[in-house]
Amino acid sequence: MVLSEKSRIFFREFRQNFHTTGAILPSGPALAEEMTRCLAHMPRGPMRLLEVGPGTGPITRVAARRMIPQDSLEAVEINPVFASTLRLVIDHEPEFAAARGQIQVVEKNILELSSEPRYDAIFCGLPFNNFEPQEVGALFDAMIGMLKPGGELSYFEYWAIRSMKLPFAGRKGRERLKG
């Protein structure tokens, strides 16, 4: 699947499912590299990895490249269109060939997963600015609870997105975005 197809899918989902999508385009390669950088300095051995909100897979792609044969990656995506797209990407794009059997796409809400500590690293691409504070708290509590001792959690927030959203948000949304 070429980049422009993924971008079209992403933009369509942004328009139709803004609350859970939150970005106009998929994350770029530089962000994906930064998000998975922890794999380069963590003690190596079999690792269990979790990606929350992988979308069309830019972070998944870099994580797959950094995985060793004993690693596994669960990519948890709530959006069925993104989950289906990511499965196709993993099954058909050559960059995933080496790690294809080690990656599982799970279509569900992260809060529905068991909270036992089992992951060495978690990469999170959720649009936290779209969520209410209690939702953000529940998401972070769940992810931190899923990390093994010494595990790493990588997440990001788009720079200036709060100020860009303010003119379009209702009163309640403006209060939330102002912090």
Question: What are these model-derived regions, one by one?
Answer:
Residues E5-M42:
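Class I SAM-dependent methyltransferase Rossmann-like catalytic core
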Residues G137-P149:
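A short glycine-rich, Lys/Arg-flanked "PGG" loop and its adjoining helix->strand segment in the class I
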